[in-house]
Each structure stands twice: as structure tokens, then as C-alpha cells.
Amino acid sequence: MNFDKLHHLFEKIKKEWKEDSHVEHEFRNKQYTTDLGQISMEIPFLHNKYLNHYTDLSQVKTSLEFELRKTIKEKREYYGGEAEARTYAEKPFGSSIKTSEKMRVYLDADEDIINIEAKVKYVEMMLNYLDHVLKQVSARNYHVKNAIEWERFINGN
């Protein structure tokens, strides 16, 4: 998955949460209990929606981590002079690297590795956002309960 797709997906998720998290402070026709009941009934569906997003992104992260491990192995072979001859024909490399310190420098600066690591970090940021969204969805039960208790208090019940 490229950065544009990840960014588009993240913007879509944030837009969905902005819409889903909005609660009218002025409840329709002052029917507090009905509106709060509706909000309460939507909580499991919201939780499922954002849990699915979280699960999908966790799978993307796992795939990227596997891709990163594979790429690091290929780059170690390339920089160490152990890759296939056709690899060097396509992308020549002057000499093989013998020290682990120098290998680390080349791996840390490799563009392919940097791009995959950047995607992993971006997906981690998205997962962190979704983790907070899921906590807010779970907390909605308590917010609805408090609002209903407030309504009872105001009405003298």
C-alpha cells in the first residue's frame, strides 16, 4: 500500500469519526430519552465499524513488517556482495561491505528500507488514532448513562 492510499484512508476514517462522534447538544423535540436511547443503540455498530478499521490496519502493518524484514535481508546480501549477478547488473554496487558497523550505515540510509519504515510508522499513528476512537466509543455508554441520570434529576425522579 502506498502513502497516497494510506493518507486517503486515514482522512476517510477521520471524516467518518467526525460525523459519528457528533452528538446534538440540543436534542430533537426535547425527547432526551428517545435520542439517548438511539445513541446507546448505535454504540455496538460504531464499535464494530472502528474495530474493523483497526483490524484491517493491523494486518497492513503486519504485512509491511514482513516486507521490511525481507527487504533488509535482500539489502544485506546486496551490500555484502552475496546477491545474484543479475542484481548487480541492474544496479551496480562498487564493493562489498565487510564490517557490521558500515553495513548498518548503508541499511539505515537505504531508500527502500526508509520508505517501508515510514509506512510502518504512519500505520502505527493510524492505529493509535483508532485506539483512541475505540476508547471513546466504549466510553459513550457512560456518557449516555450520565445524561439519562441528569434528565431524571432535572425531572425530579
Per-region residue spans from a language model:
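Extended, amphipathic alpha-helical coiled-coil scaffold segments used for oligomerization/tethering
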Residues: 69-115
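Extended, charged low-complexity scaffolding/tethering segments
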Residues: 1-27
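Short, well-structured hydrophobic secondary-structure segments
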Residues: 41-80
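Short, charge-rich amphipathic alpha-helices with coiled-coil/heptad character
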Residues: 20-55
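Long amphipathic all-alpha helical oligomerization modules
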Residues: 103-127, 152-157
